[in-house]
Amino acid sequence: MAQEQTKRGGGGGEDDDPTGSTAAGQERREKLTEETDDLLDEIDDVLEENAEDFVRAYVQKGGQ
């Protein structure tokens, strides 16, 4: 008896252009990094101006 092998294709057709998806992923990663840096800068500014108030509010809410 002969055995037949069936070759199955891997997933959808999006793998046809790996450089395009890589470039899009890199662009999204850079945008998220920039947004995260902006948010951290804003938090730093708030803490520089109101560190005492921030700590006081944090402790009042049950933080340690």
From Swiss-Prot:
Post-translational modification summary for this protein: Is modified by deamidation of its C-terminal glutamine to glutamate by the deamidase Dop, a prerequisite to the subsequent pupylation process.
Coiled-coil stretches: 23-52
Sorted UniProt keywords: Coiled coil, Isopeptide bond, Ubl conjugation pathway
HAMAP family: Pup
Xref: InterPro entries: Ubiquitin-like_Pup (IPR008515)
Domain notes: The N-terminal unstructured half of Pup provides a signal required to initiate unfolding and degradation by the proteasome but is not needed for pupylation, while the C-terminal helical half of Pup interacts with ARC to target proteins to the proteasome.
Keyword hit for Coiled coil: yes
Cross-link (Isoglutamyl lysine isopeptide (Gln-Lys) (interchain with K-? in acceptor proteins)): Q64
Region feature (ARC ATPase binding): 21-58
Short name of any one Pfam family annotated for the protein: Pup
Job of this protein: Protein modifier that is covalently attached to lysine residues of substrate proteins, thereby targeting them for proteasomal degradation. The tagging system is termed pupylation.
Record-level GO BP terms: modification-dependent protein catabolic process; proteasomal protein catabolic process; protein pupylation
Oligomer status and interactors: Strongly interacts with the proteasome-associated ATPase ARC through a hydrophobic interface; the interacting region of Pup lies in its C-terminal half. There is one Pup binding site per ARC hexamer ring.
Residues with Deamidated glutamine modification: Q64
Stated family: Belongs to the prokaryotic ubiquitin-like protein family.
GO molecular function, one term: proteasome binding
Name the record gives this protein: Prokaryotic ubiquitin-like protein Pup
